[in-house]
Amino acid sequence: MINSFRLLKDRKSKKGFSLLEILLVLGAIAALIVAAFMIFPKVQASQRIDRESRNLTAIQAGVKSLYGGRAKISSINTDSFIASKNAPENMIQDGKLINEWKGNVQVEYSGNHGKYNIIYDAVPASDCSKLIAAVSGNFVSIDVYNGNGGTQVKNLEEGKNIDIAATSAACFSEDNSTIIFASVI
């Protein structure tokens, strides 16, 4: 027993980390980095959709604030909307309305019964159907235009509620989409 105690006492303790321990830590760090790069784009896309759905709601509220109670809204356009200070400030860049994907946003009269359009340019295919699904309840009609042509995915005036399959098909394109959201005052 004394000999075994002396052997333990004489033995010098090793300082530092072994190669195996270092490789284990590096492997764990690499796994965390890979996981972060897989999750981060999804979180970013979700945040873009959330911001744009809030922007669309703010544009609608601004138009209603500006033109609510008026029988005639034919003077509505993007420039007058921005000048009225009803446009979301986070969208105004160089006197234009710009969306999260750096596309133009236009507000215009659609020509009938107090109806106006909010036009979103440069919406990527990966976010197109998600944006439409997030805000479809706020609009009477929604149209998607891209390299595949144009598709109406909702028209309450014709009794056509949102068609998710048609939305996915319309948004599936190598080109960015232009989405026209129609609303009524």
What is each of the regions a protein language model found here?
Residues K12, I39, I118-D121:
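Short, flexible active-site loop motifs that bind/organize anionic cofactors or intermediates
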